[in-house]
């Protein structure tokens, strides 16, 4: 009798990189360069008005252990643009190692970037390390949001295993003006009901505005709060506006975030964000 020896299979990992460069030319903001490979894609849909939109997309359908993903946007001096993601990002159970995501955006002098990725949904056993950095030149500003959902409440999912590290930073002339690290693991999930942790929330978001007019936006931002099921706090200081939000489910959080972004931007969200 011959014994069959199982063959070990090496799972293919996704690896993607997308870079978009915009510059002002002939009185308008235009595409200067577009480079993409692997699972990362970027496109510029037609929009009304003179503020272009850049939409990033991970064609692999989600992230798991060993995956690599990079999004980069470079805005020239005087450029204003909005960047977002095609859909929510999903991080699935990791067999070995963590998925790594790098988001690096640069905003030239007197430019402005709205970085509005859709939410990240973390599934049981996910392992994800993400670094988001926005570098501002003198006179530049940005509005950014990051939303995280712990499982799908509608499916009755409750997470107990997770390895999530997320670091968001905004720099001006190379110096940090806002740094926000977040780490969630098994121990944090076990204590998530405590007031010092998530207070039982399963969805969380941070929204930050840095640049001219940021502190003046505190009043309109607070007036836009009030979505049922969402707890929120807002503060403004040193040229920054920061809001933090918690909810028991991703949908009320998404509605609240969408309302805030619409108020702060003074115009509709990108079409892919339709709520």
From Swiss-Prot:
Required for maturation of urease via the functional incorporation of the urease nickel metallocenter. UreD, UreF and UreG form a complex that acts as a GTP-hydrolysis-dependent molecular chaperone, activating the urease apoprotein by helping to assemble the nickel containing metallocenter of UreC. The UreE protein probably delivers the nickel. Keywords: Chaperone, Cytoplasm, Nickel insertion. GO terms for cellular component: cytoplasm. The keyword Amino-acid biosynthesis does not apply. Its main location: cytoplasm. InterPro entries: UreD. Belongs to the UreD family. It is found in: Cytoplasm. GO terms for molecular function: nickel cation binding. It comes from Cereibacter sphaeroides (strain ATCC 17029 / ATH 2.4.9) (Rhodobacter sphaeroides). This is Urease accessory protein UreD. Pfam families: UreD. The gene is ureD.
